[in-house]
C-alpha cells in the first residue's frame, strides 16, 4: 500500500507539473486514521492502531504544498490541529467569503502553516472518539486533547510531550488538568447529544437523484454494516445482515421501490452466485470473494408504518413495489426471506418517484 500511494502521488504531481498547475494548486496529503491493524509497520512509537483512542489510532500526517502561497515545505506545525480546521483554512487561503450564519468547529491554521503570525496561538481543546455503535456512549474510546495533554476515556491522562507513547498515566498528579478537560468534554457532549437521534437521511424523490440508490453500507444496525464487497458477497448472518435506512421523502406521491441482492449493473438474479472479481497484484481485494447464492422466496418492504410483502418469482433479478408515500422523514427496511426462515437484508434498493 505504501508503495502504491507513493507511486500514485508521484503520478499526480507529475501531471500538475506537466499541466503548469503546480505553482497555484493547494496540494494536500493526509490520511483518514492511524496505522492500519494489518501488517506491522512503523508507527513512530505511538500507542494504538486504527480505531484506537490513543494517538496511534487517530494522529495522522497532513502535508500542504502551495508554492504561490509560500508553502513549499520545511516547516513543522507544533500546536494541535484537526480535520475541522481544513475548511476554514481553505476559505482563508482562497479568499472566499465565509458563509453567513455558519459557525465552524475548527479555525484557519494558515498563519501556522506560513509562520506569519504576530500573536500567540490559543491553548485549544479538541475531542475525538471511535464510537462504532448504533447509539453513542459517553466517553467511549475518547480522547480530549491539547497540544500537551491527552485525556483518554475520561480516566487516563498522558503528557504527550514527555510521554508520546502514552505509557504513564499521570491523572492523579494533575487533577486540575483532568477537571478542565472533563468540563470541556461534558459541554461538548451536551451540545451533541440532542442530535444523536437525527441520523442523516437519504432523500427519496429529489429531482437531482431520482431514482435514489440505497446500499447496505448505509444501513443503521446494531451490528457492523456491510462496508465492503466481501461482506455482501458472503451474505453475512446475524446483526450485520439486516438494517434500516433513514430516509426523507421529498414530495408526496407514488413511488416504485425495487429490491435487489446484487447491484443493477451486475444484471444477476436474486438467487444467483457472483463470480470472484479480478485479483489486485500484491493485495487481497474484497472483490475476489466468491458471491454466495441465497434462495429467498419472499421479499418484504417497510417504510414507516407501511408494510408489504411479495413472493419472489423464480430467477427474478429484482422485486418491485409500487406504493404511495407522504413527504417527511421516516425509516425504510427491506429484506429477503428464505423458506427456512433465514432473513437477509436487500443489499441494494432503487427508489423512483413516478
Positions of PLM-derived features:
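Aromatic-acidic/polar surface patches that form glycan- and anion
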Residues: 2-5, 76-83, 102, 174, ...
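Beta-strand elements within well-structured catalytic alpha/beta cores of enzymes
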Residues: 2-5, 9, 26-31, 61-62, ...
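Metal-dependent active-site segment of extracytoplasmic phospho-/sulfohydrolases and closely related
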Residues: 4-43
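Non-transmembrane alpha-helical segments in soluble domains
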Residues: 9, 13, 17, 87-91, ...
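C-terminal cap/loop subdomain of S1 sulfatases and analogous C-terminal strand-loop tails that border
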Residues: 35-53, 71-75, 79, 84-87, ...
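The feature captures the short pre-catalytic strand/loop hairpin that immediately precedes
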Residues: 63-73
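Short beta-strand-to-coil "C-cap" segments at the C-terminal boundary of structured domains/repeats
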Residues: 65-67, 160, 350-354
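Long, internal low-complexity/basic segments
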Residues: 86, 170-354
Amino acid at each position: 500500500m505504501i508503495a502504491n500511494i507513493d507511486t500514485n502521488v508521484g503520478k499526480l504531481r507529475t501531471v500538475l507539473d506537466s499541466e503548469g498547475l503546480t505553482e497555484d494548486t493547494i496540494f494536500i496529503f493526509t490520511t483518514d486514521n492511524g496505522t492500519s491493524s494489518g501488517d506491522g509497520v512503523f508507527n513512530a512509537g505511538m500507542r494504538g492502531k486504527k480505531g484506537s483512542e490513543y494517538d496511534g489510532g487517530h494522529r495522522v500526517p497532513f502535508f500542504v504544498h502551495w508554492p504561490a502561497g509560500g508553502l513549499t515545505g520545511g516547516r513543522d506545525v507544533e500546536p494541535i490541529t484537526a480535520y475541522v480546521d481544513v475548511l476554514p483554512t481553505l476559505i482563508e487561503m482562497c479568499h472566499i467569503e465565509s458563509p453567513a450564519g455558519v459557525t465552524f468547529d475548527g479555525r484557519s491554521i494558515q498563519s501556522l502553516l506560513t509562520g506569519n503570525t504576530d500573536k500567540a496561538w490559543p491553548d485549544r481543546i479538541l475531542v475525538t472518539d471511535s464510537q462504532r455503535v448504533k447509539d453513542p456512549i459517553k466517553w467511549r474510546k475518547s480522547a480530549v486533547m491539547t497540544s500537551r495533554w491527552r485525556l483518554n476515556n475520561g480516566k487516563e491522562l498522558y503528557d504527550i510531550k514527555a510521554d508520546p507513547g502514552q505509557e504513564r498515566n499521570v491523572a492523579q498528579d494533575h487533577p486540575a488538568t483532568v477537571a478542565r478537560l472533563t468540563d470541556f468534554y461534558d459541554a461538548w457532549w451536551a451540545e451533541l447529544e440532542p442530535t444523536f437521534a437525527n441520523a442523516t437521511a437519504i432523500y427519496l424523490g429529489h429531482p437531482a437523484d431520482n431514482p435514489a440508490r440505497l446500499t447496505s453500507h448505509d444501513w443503521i444496525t446494531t451490528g457492523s454494516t456491510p462496508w465492503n464487497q466481501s461482506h455482501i458477497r458472503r451474505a453475512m448472518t446475524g446483526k450485520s445482515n439486516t438494517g434500516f435506512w433513514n430516509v426523507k421523502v421529498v414530495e408526496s406521491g407514488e413511488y416504485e421501490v425495487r429490491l435487489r441482492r446484487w447491484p443493477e449493473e451486475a444484471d444477476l438474479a436474486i438467487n444467483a452466485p457472483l463470480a470472484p472479481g479480478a485479483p489486485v497484484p500484491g493485495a487481497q481485494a474484497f472483490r475476489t470473494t466468491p458471491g454466495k447464492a441465497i434462495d429467498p422466496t419472499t421479499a418484504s418492504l417497510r417504510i414507516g408504518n407501511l408494510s408489504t410483502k411479495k413472493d419472489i418469482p423464480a430467477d427474478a433479478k429484482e422485486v418491485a413495489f409500487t406504493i404511495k408515500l407522504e413527504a417527511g422523514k421516516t425509516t425504510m427496511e427491506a429484506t429477503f426471506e428464505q423458506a427456512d426462515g433465514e432473513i437477509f437484508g436487500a443489499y441494494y434498493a432503487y427508489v423512483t418517484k413516478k
